[in-house]
Amino acid sequence: MAKIKITWVKSAIGYKFDQAATIKALGFKKLNQSVIQDDSAAIRGMILKVRHLVVLEEVT
């Protein structure tokens, strides 16, 4: 399965609670942290929800 690298670049303060919960569900603990996740429909849906807070890169 393909992998994607997600970097959290903007704070979730001031946004709805469910967006902060999505950031935590993606595995982030600190701002500017990067995580590598499987490229699945569930992960893509979470990224879509917080696309204004994260940067996405494909890992080859």
UniProtKB/Swiss-Prot annotation:
The keyword Ribonucleoprotein applies. SUPFAM superfamilies: Ribosomal protein L30p/L7e. Gene3D superfamilies: Ribosomal protein L30, ferredoxin-like fold domain (3.30.1390.20). Signal peptide: none annotated. GO terms for molecular function: structural constituent of ribosome. Keywords: Ribonucleoprotein, Ribosomal protein. This is Large ribosomal subunit protein uL30.
